Amino acid sequence: MTTGRKVMVLGLDGMEPYTAKRLMDAGKMPNLKKMVENGAARENLELLGSMPTITPAQWTTLACGCNPGVHGITDFWNQDPENLDTIIYGLDSRLCQAEQLWNVTARAGLKTLVWQWPGSSWPPSSDSENLMVVDGTQPASVNYSIANIDIEKYVEASTEITENEFIDHIGSKNLGDAATDCVIDELDLEEESDEDKYAEFDASKTDAKANRAELLLNRYKMKRIKNVDFHKQGGAAMEQLAKVPFDKIKSTISEPTKWAKELPEGAREFITYTAGGQMRRPCLILKNADGIYDTVEVYRSKKDAEPLCTIVGEEMVTDVLDENLDHGKKTMATRSYKVLEIAPDGSKVRMWMSTAFKVDCDDRWSPKSIYKEVIENCGYVPPFTQMGGTTLEFAQKILTPSWEHNAMWQSRAINYLIKEKDLDVVFSHHHFIDHSAHQFWNFALQKPGMAPEEEYQKQIDKTYEVADEYIGSYLHLLDEGWTIILTSDHGEQIHTMPPARLGSAGGASAGIMRELGYTVMKKDENGNDTAEVDFSKTKALAVRTSYIWINTKGRDKYGSRQVRSRRTDHRRSLQIS
């Protein structure tokens, strides 16, 4: 091993010891085995965590060395100090009340990089020239909450489809032929910025279906939320996350017309859309030398001589640079494409288009100059997918491969900065195990109507094999005087039945607490419960994932209860009146 001063904290969110050890012992994680054999670890690779086992709270504990009750990042959302039913975004370093270790190392003269560390890294809490910070305002991936300007899309093209159809991800709004004719050359739309739009989010004032989609897709942009979850069917959070909406495109396959260039014999065409259905992109289906259709080319327009990208077979094509719209203004963005199916006779194509990430996006890189260096030397920040939970094919062909690409890009970027900036300390985090777990782990125990559980079990193993590849990309540092600390924050559970939901990741929970009589909702004119808490009758409210607050007089804005405390046999009991 090493005796040098250089240290890397290699964080893998959601990586749990039992699966890791099982696969290591089976020879499927050789890089992890190399670390264990040449370093130090508990026999079963177990880690010591703190409560609650929530990403931002745990990673802040790792950064500060104290529990959430001390450092103050207590969940994805912190409690609003003024209103019990309101929560404020918790992944904000300004909420952290303890000193992060990276500020200590930077102050000590060590060149330090903090990369996508969720909970307490952004904005930078030190102005030291030795400190570099990249994002960390959400756990998913670098730039995710600010660069994604066009949601991912699932394209079905067929000779049997007679009309082009764009189906919006939120409202299932069918734009039909209007979308086909709406090719945008110049657009001047006045839209409020995300910063203004999501400053306050009151779910009780929005359509229920739209509200669910907004929370799911844009929760990392919201600063303050007032939302009540009733858990009517006791659904599991993992199953909700597995059903992330996406745009769906239906397109007719036909003989190509009005192309400026000469096309190969037998070429066919279809249309896909970008920019929320406001820009169309013509596509060609081409034969190989054997006369089998196996290639799709995507073009900006039929006037172009060269395609935006060429997809052969089922390969994933990344870093596809194209125009898109950001609040109505044209901007350059990058996305990935993958053909899921192409009929040998060219009569059918199924294709995935990833989220589009705008390229001009250095807002959460400090100093900003390192963003340009990274994309010039390591490639554009790669989007990932929110699809893949309930559909095994998506998990196998899209989710795991896109995360593998994202992870290895991150490795290239961090290794580049280590070398070029002569770094001494790195705090890094990657989220692909946790995200994959939320998408499909729960189907590794057979669920009605789902693919065989064994297939999902194989996909879990594949995810950990990608993790091992990612770990291995840093092991060269051991020969260069580095110490690597591999760590995680929590594991994941698999349920045979949906668990009882006492908490809510996105607001207050009125399910069990309402049944027990502790939480009372205001009534509408028909005597039905609304989504607003009646604090004059509410004794206590479950808020966020892990907390119950007593509606206390003298402390809370609408406090209605007196609380008395007494100790008996070293236990404390509360009397609420």
What would you call each of these model-derived segments?
Residues 11, 67-69, 106-111, 419-423:
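Short, solvent-exposed loop/edge-beta patches enriched in aromatic
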Residues 369-400, 430-458:
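Active-site-proximal, well-structured secondary-structure segments within enzyme catalytic domains
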Residues 400-421, 425-426, 442-484, 494, ...:
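A long, amphipathic alpha-helix that forms part
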Residues 2-5, 12, 18-21, 26-27, ...:
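Secreted, luminal/periplasmic, and some membrane-associated catalytic domains
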Residues 51, 119-121, 433:
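Positions that flank functional sites
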Residues 4-7, 113-114, 360, 406-440:
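Active-site regions of oxyanion-processing enzymes, predominantly non-cytosolic
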Residues 49-52, 57-63, 71, 75-79:
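Nucleic acid-processing catalytic cores of prokaryotic defense/repair systems
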Residues 42, 68-71:
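Short helix C-cap/helix-to-loop transition motifs enriched in small/turn-promoting residues
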